[in-house]
Amino acid sequence: MFANVGFRTLRVSRGPLYGSCSQIISFSKRTFYSSAKSGYQSNNSHGDAYSSGSQSGPFTYKTAVAFQPKDRDDLIYQKLKDSIRSPTGEDNYFVTSNNVHDIFAGVADGVGGWAEHGYDSSAISRELCKKMDEISTALAENSSKETLLTPKKIIGAAYAKIRDEKVVKVGGTTAIVAHFPSNGKLEVANLGDSWCGVFRDSKLVFQTKFQTVGFNAPYQLSIIPEEMLKEAERRGSKYILNTPRDADEYSFQLKKKDIIILATDGVTDNIATDDIELFLKDNAARTNDELQLLSQKFVDNVVSLSKDPNYPSVFAQEISKLTGKNYSGGKEDDITVVVVRVD
């Protein structure tokens, strides 16, 4: 923690961040276009970091979900009734469990910048999670299709379905999906800046990496009409148009009592992994018998910090580095977590 004296307050939920740095236009919504092609390069594959655990027999998993949407009193949201009704805001999630030994889970975060242009930013993340839930359920019920049960393929199949069905007119979303199989070999596919972390004895032992084209501009799966693409081209801009093939893939061997967290950037923009470690250590007793209460308390704590104008959030510190000015304050955003415990 650093001293708050001399720090400008960060109020990202209300509009532009005012400062002397002219290249910083607005931090209130994430970007869905870029003036240049991404400079991010990824090998799209990450191997095991740990050898197989000693646990015998099939792994068992317990899950909990907690979320809190940000306040939607801005006029732009009043015009988007579906967005207001979404209980998770622009975030969405799914958890598919045919039995306690085989689980799929994921979160998706609709890119909020579209709301400023009159589009429901929650639509694409909601439809994507709905399709990922349907696909993972159908595949899990058919053991002969076990080879198809990869998170990356689930993202790809779901994205193809929502494009074909044309329910979503405009939007962009991140996506992270994890498979928790009976052998404990965690598989994760991530596209964008949502996050997965594995904690062992309250210490981080594995995490995914963010994919971005720039500050506050994540990789995203987008649906954009042709006329909007042409208009962007006339302006000399480019929308961020990723495909499921761009998702990074990870694998990691779990052990009994591991805690796994899938989270949208409402968490990681506010707190660091050190903070999560401290929270899990302070609430170790609840990880055994009160996973839902633990998850909700975690979200409540992050929400409180996101509304604190004096809190030195991760987001505020990044802005300080970019601008050379000292900013403080949490970043108000939708916050969603899926928490999994290995039993």
Swiss-Prot record:
<keyword id="KW-0378">Hydrolase</keyword>
<dbReference type="GO" id="GO:1904775">
    <property type="term" value="P:positive regulation of ubiquinone biosynthetic process"/>
</dbReference>
<keyword id="KW-0809">Transit peptide</keyword>
<dbReference type="GO" id="GO:0005635">
    <property type="term" value="C:nuclear envelope"/>
</dbReference>
<comment type="function">
    <text>Protein phosphatase which positively regulates biosynthesis of the ubiquinone, coenzyme Q. Dephosphorylates and activates the ubiquinone biosynthesis protein CAT5/COQ7. Also dephosphorylates CIT1 on 'Ser-462', which leads to its activation.</text>
</comment>
<keyword id="KW-0479">Metal-binding</keyword>
<dbReference type="GO" id="GO:0004722">
    <property type="term" value="F:protein serine/threonine phosphatase activity"/>
</dbReference>
<feature type="domain" description="PPM-type phosphatase">
    <location>
        <begin position="76"/>
        <end position="342"/>
    </location>
</feature>
<dbReference type="GO" id="GO:0005739">
    <property type="term" value="C:mitochondrion"/>
</dbReference>
<dbReference type="InterPro" id="IPR001932">
    <property type="entry name" value="PPM-type_phosphatase-like_dom"/>
</dbReference>
<feature type="binding site">
    <location>
        <position position="109"/>
    </location>
    <ligand>
        <name>Mn(2+) 1</name>
    </ligand>
</feature>
<feature type="binding site">
    <location>
        <position position="110"/>
    </location>
    <ligand>
        <name>Mn(2+) 1</name>
    </ligand>
</feature>
<keyword id="KW-0496">Mitochondrion</keyword>
<dbReference type="GO" id="GO:0046872">
    <property type="term" value="F:metal ion binding"/>
</dbReference>
<keyword id="KW-0904">Protein phosphatase</keyword>
<dbReference type="InterPro" id="IPR036457">
    <property type="entry name" value="PPM-type-like_dom_sf"/>
</dbReference>
<dbReference type="InterPro" id="IPR039123">
    <property type="entry name" value="PPTC7"/>
</dbReference>
<keyword id="KW-0460">Magnesium</keyword>
<feature type="binding site">
    <location>
        <position position="265"/>
    </location>
    <ligand>
        <name>Mn(2+) 2</name>
    </ligand>
</feature>
<feature type="binding site">
    <location>
        <position position="109"/>
    </location>
    <ligand>
        <name>Mn(2+) 2</name>
    </ligand>
</feature>
<dbReference type="GO" id="GO:0070262">
    <property type="term" value="P:peptidyl-serine dephosphorylation"/>
</dbReference>
<feature type="transit peptide" description="Mitochondrion">
    <location>
        <begin position="1"/>
        <end position="39"/>
    </location>
</feature>
<dbReference type="GO" id="GO:0004721">
    <property type="term" value="F:phosphoprotein phosphatase activity"/>
</dbReference>
<protein>
    <recommendedName>
        <fullName>Protein phosphatase 2C homolog 7, mitochondrial</fullName>
        <ecNumber>3.1.3.16</ecNumber>
    </recommendedName>
</protein>
<dbReference type="Pfam" id="PF07228">
    <property type="entry name" value="SpoIIE"/>
</dbReference>
<keyword id="KW-0464">Manganese</keyword>
